[in-house]
Amino acid sequence: LREAVAKAPFMVAGTGRFDTRVMERLHERVFCKVGAEGVYCAALPGQGLGVAIKIDDGNNARAAEVVMAAVIEALVPLLADEPALLRSLSEPTLRNWNGIEVGRLRASAALRGALSAQSAAGAV
């Protein structure tokens, strides 16, 4: 399944979607898929980990994508150009109907600290 998805990540979620963008760049190192109602799951085969996230923010996957990007950024060894993609996904800009930036979403400092500690401890 991972090989098939790595060859055609577009088939998982479609153009420009979080799942597609991550798997296009990270290939078989990450398999992720959004579900209904803010559920996100991922397999990180190199780390021997599965990740399941459930967040109810009123916008189904928006906050879950931010958390999943932070998890991947912290736990998966990345190539030189990959941190920028994950940072853009873990800290998206919020714009109003006029296109004016009104804020950002981001993973909490507590989550980033916990992920950093896990990664540094070699628990992954």
Question: Residue spans of the language-model regions?
Answer:
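Structured C-terminal helix/loop/strand segments within mature extracytoplasmic catalytic/sensor domains
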Residues: 1-124
